[in-house]
Protein backbone atom coordinates (compact mmCIF):
# COMPACT_ATOMS: atom_id res chain seq x y z
CA UNK A 1 0.00 0.00 0.00
CA UNK A 2 1.55 3.29 -1.18
CA UNK A 3 -0.05 5.39 1.54
CA UNK A 4 1.11 3.16 4.38
CA UNK A 5 4.70 3.47 3.18
CA UNK A 6 4.61 7.25 3.70
CA UNK A 7 5.73 8.58 7.12
CA UNK A 8 2.74 10.92 7.43
CA UNK A 9 1.48 9.88 10.90
CA UNK A 10 4.93 10.39 12.43
CA UNK A 11 5.41 13.66 10.56
CA UNK A 12 2.10 15.16 11.71
CA UNK A 13 2.70 14.00 15.26
CA UNK A 14 5.95 15.95 15.40
CA UNK A 15 4.48 19.00 13.63
CA UNK A 16 1.64 19.22 16.15
CA UNK A 17 4.13 18.85 18.98
CA UNK A 18 6.24 21.87 18.02
CA UNK A 19 3.88 24.32 16.28
CA UNK A 20 1.66 26.87 17.99
CA UNK A 21 -2.02 26.05 18.39
CA UNK A 22 -3.33 27.86 15.30
CA UNK A 23 -0.11 28.08 13.26
CA UNK A 24 -0.49 27.04 9.61
CA UNK A 25 1.60 24.28 8.04
CA UNK A 26 2.53 25.02 4.42
CA UNK A 27 3.94 22.14 2.34
CA UNK A 28 5.12 21.94 -1.27
CA UNK A 29 4.28 18.89 -3.38
CA UNK A 30 3.23 17.39 -6.70
CA UNK A 31 0.79 14.66 -7.61
CA UNK A 32 0.32 11.93 -6.60
CA UNK A 33 2.27 12.88 -3.46
CA UNK A 34 0.06 15.90 -2.75
CA UNK A 35 -3.10 13.77 -2.74
CA UNK A 36 -1.51 11.37 -0.27
CA UNK A 37 -0.41 14.34 1.82
CA UNK A 38 -3.93 15.79 1.96
CA UNK A 39 -5.52 12.41 2.70
CA UNK A 40 -3.03 11.99 5.51
CA UNK A 41 -4.58 14.94 7.35
CA UNK A 42 -8.00 15.78 5.91
CA UNK A 43 -9.10 17.12 9.30
CA UNK A 44 -6.63 20.01 9.08
CA UNK A 45 -6.42 20.49 5.30
CA UNK A 46 -7.48 24.03 4.28
CA UNK A 47 -6.74 24.60 0.58
CA UNK A 48 -4.07 24.52 -2.14
CA UNK A 49 -2.14 27.24 -3.89
CA UNK A 50 -1.00 26.51 -7.44
CA UNK A 51 2.45 27.88 -8.13
CA UNK A 52 2.73 28.61 -11.86
CA UNK A 53 6.40 28.43 -12.79
CA UNK A 54 8.34 30.43 -15.35
CA UNK A 55 10.20 27.31 -16.45
CA UNK A 56 8.59 23.96 -17.28
CA UNK A 57 10.14 20.52 -16.66
CA UNK A 58 9.73 16.88 -17.77
CA UNK A 59 11.05 17.51 -21.29
CA UNK A 60 11.92 13.82 -21.70
CA UNK A 61 8.19 13.05 -21.55
CA UNK A 62 7.09 15.95 -23.77
CA UNK A 63 5.78 13.59 -26.47
CA UNK A 64 3.70 11.65 -23.96
CA UNK A 65 2.30 14.27 -21.61
CA UNK A 66 2.20 18.05 -21.04
CA UNK A 67 5.29 19.76 -19.71
CA UNK A 68 5.03 20.33 -15.98
CA UNK A 69 4.86 24.05 -15.22
CA UNK A 70 3.23 24.14 -11.79
CA UNK A 71 3.59 22.90 -8.24
CA UNK A 72 1.05 22.59 -5.43
CA UNK A 73 1.38 24.31 -2.08
CA UNK A 74 -0.93 22.70 0.49
CA UNK A 75 -2.01 24.59 3.59
CA UNK A 76 -3.02 22.84 6.81
CA UNK A 77 -4.02 24.15 10.20
CA UNK A 78 -6.18 23.68 13.26
CA UNK A 79 -9.13 26.03 13.54
CA UNK A 80 -8.77 29.55 12.19
CA UNK A 81 -5.19 30.03 11.06
CA UNK A 82 -3.53 33.44 10.48
CA UNK A 83 -3.93 34.83 6.96
CA UNK A 84 -2.69 38.23 5.82
CA UNK A 85 -3.58 38.48 2.12
CA UNK A 86 -1.18 40.43 -0.08
CA UNK A 87 -3.36 42.51 -2.36
CA UNK A 88 -2.71 42.46 -6.10
CA UNK A 89 -2.65 45.55 -8.30
CA UNK A 90 -5.14 45.88 -11.16
CA UNK A 91 -7.27 48.37 -13.05
CA UNK A 92 -9.45 50.68 -10.92
CA UNK A 93 -13.17 50.11 -11.24
CA UNK A 94 -16.46 51.35 -9.81
CA UNK A 95 -19.97 49.95 -9.48
CA UNK A 96 -23.15 51.98 -9.37
CA UNK A 97 -26.02 50.80 -7.21
CA UNK A 98 -29.48 52.32 -7.57
CA UNK A 99 -32.02 51.40 -4.95
CA UNK A 100 -35.29 52.03 -6.79
CA UNK A 101 -37.85 54.62 -5.66
CA UNK A 102 -40.09 55.32 -2.71
CA UNK A 103 -43.71 56.46 -2.75
CA UNK A 104 -44.56 59.36 -0.48
CA UNK A 105 -47.69 61.37 0.13
CA UNK A 106 -46.79 63.70 -2.73
CA UNK A 107 -45.64 61.10 -5.23
CA UNK A 108 -42.69 59.02 -6.27
CA UNK A 109 -39.28 60.07 -4.86
CA UNK A 110 -36.16 58.38 -6.33
CA UNK A 111 -33.58 56.99 -3.95
CA UNK A 112 -29.99 58.21 -4.35
CA UNK A 113 -27.49 56.28 -6.47
CA UNK A 114 -24.47 54.90 -4.62
CA UNK A 115 -21.09 54.33 -6.26
CA UNK A 116 -18.58 51.79 -4.96
CA UNK A 117 -15.05 52.85 -5.94
CA UNK A 118 -12.07 50.49 -6.07
CA UNK A 119 -8.56 51.74 -6.81
CA UNK A 120 -7.56 48.46 -8.43
CA UNK A 121 -6.49 46.32 -5.48
CA UNK A 122 -7.74 42.75 -5.57
CA UNK A 123 -7.52 39.82 -3.20
CA UNK A 124 -5.04 37.11 -4.25
CA UNK A 125 -6.23 34.17 -6.32
CA UNK A 126 -5.22 30.56 -5.77
CA UNK A 127 -2.91 30.54 -8.82
CA UNK A 128 0.26 32.57 -8.24
CA UNK A 129 3.10 33.12 -10.70
CA UNK A 130 6.74 33.20 -9.63
CA UNK A 131 9.97 32.57 -11.50
CA UNK A 132 11.91 29.43 -10.57
CA UNK A 133 14.96 29.50 -8.31
CA UNK A 134 17.35 29.50 -11.28
CA UNK A 135 16.27 33.06 -12.04
CA UNK A 136 17.80 34.19 -8.73
CA UNK A 137 21.24 32.71 -9.37
CA UNK A 138 23.08 29.42 -9.07
CA UNK A 139 21.10 26.68 -7.30
CA UNK A 140 22.57 24.16 -4.86
CA UNK A 141 19.57 21.83 -4.45
CA UNK A 142 17.40 19.99 -6.96
CA UNK A 143 14.19 21.14 -5.22
CA UNK A 144 15.35 24.66 -4.39
CA UNK A 145 12.49 27.15 -4.13
CA UNK A 146 12.68 30.82 -5.18
CA UNK A 147 13.25 33.26 -2.34
CA UNK A 148 10.61 35.61 -3.76
CA UNK A 149 7.91 32.93 -3.48
CA UNK A 150 8.95 32.02 0.05
CA UNK A 151 8.84 35.68 1.08
CA UNK A 152 5.30 35.87 -0.31
CA UNK A 153 4.17 32.86 1.73
CA UNK A 154 5.95 34.03 4.87
CA UNK A 155 4.29 37.44 4.67
CA UNK A 156 0.92 35.81 3.99
CA UNK A 157 0.94 33.65 7.13
CA UNK A 158 3.24 35.35 9.68
CA UNK A 159 4.08 38.73 11.19
CA UNK A 160 7.47 40.34 11.74
CA UNK A 161 9.26 38.71 14.66
CA UNK A 162 7.49 35.36 14.26
CA UNK A 163 9.47 32.12 14.04
CA UNK A 164 9.28 29.94 10.91
CA UNK A 165 10.24 26.24 10.98
CA UNK A 166 11.54 24.51 7.84
CA UNK A 167 12.14 20.84 8.64
CA UNK A 168 13.31 19.99 5.10
CA UNK A 169 15.41 23.08 4.53
CA UNK A 170 17.71 21.86 1.71
CA UNK A 171 19.29 25.03 0.31
CA UNK A 172 17.91 27.08 3.23
CA UNK A 173 16.09 29.52 0.98
CA UNK A 174 13.45 29.79 3.72
CA UNK A 175 16.05 31.15 6.13
CA UNK A 176 17.13 33.78 3.60
CA UNK A 177 13.49 34.74 2.98
CA UNK A 178 13.06 35.13 6.75
CA UNK A 179 16.07 37.45 6.92
CA UNK A 180 14.53 39.68 4.25
CA UNK A 181 11.11 39.69 5.95
CA UNK A 182 12.41 40.14 9.52
CA UNK A 183 11.34 36.75 10.84
CA UNK A 184 13.27 34.20 12.87
CA UNK A 185 13.88 30.79 11.34
CA UNK A 186 14.70 27.26 12.48
CA UNK A 187 16.15 25.00 9.76
CA UNK A 188 16.43 21.21 9.83
CA UNK A 189 18.21 19.19 7.12
CA UNK A 190 19.31 15.55 7.41
CA UNK A 191 21.79 15.65 4.51
CA UNK A 192 25.07 17.01 5.89
CA UNK A 193 26.32 18.23 2.51
CA UNK A 194 23.14 20.18 1.80
CA UNK A 195 23.13 21.54 5.34
CA UNK A 196 26.72 22.75 5.04
CA UNK A 197 26.08 24.39 1.66
CA UNK A 198 22.86 25.98 2.88
CA UNK A 199 24.45 27.30 6.06
CA UNK A 200 27.25 28.90 4.04
CA UNK A 201 24.67 30.46 1.74
CA UNK A 202 22.76 31.97 4.67
CA UNK A 203 25.94 33.35 6.25
CA UNK A 204 26.99 34.96 2.98
CA UNK A 205 23.55 36.52 2.53
CA UNK A 206 23.52 37.81 6.10
CA UNK A 207 26.97 39.36 5.72
CA UNK A 208 25.90 40.97 2.44
CA UNK A 209 22.90 42.61 4.09
CA UNK A 210 25.06 43.97 6.92
CA UNK A 211 27.38 45.79 4.52
Regions picked out by a protein language model, each given a short descriptive name:
Residues 202:
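Conserved hydrophobic residues forming the short capping helix/wall of the S-adenosyl-L-methionine
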Residues 205-211:
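S-adenosyl-L-methionine
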Residues 1-195:
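Core catalytic lobe of class I
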Amino acid sequence: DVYKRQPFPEMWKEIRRVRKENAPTVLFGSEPFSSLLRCGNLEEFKYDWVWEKSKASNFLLAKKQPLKAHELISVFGKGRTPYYPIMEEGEPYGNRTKRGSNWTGIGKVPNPTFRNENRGTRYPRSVIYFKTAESEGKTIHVNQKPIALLQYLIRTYTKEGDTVLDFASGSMSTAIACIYTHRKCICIEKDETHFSQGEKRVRNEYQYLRL
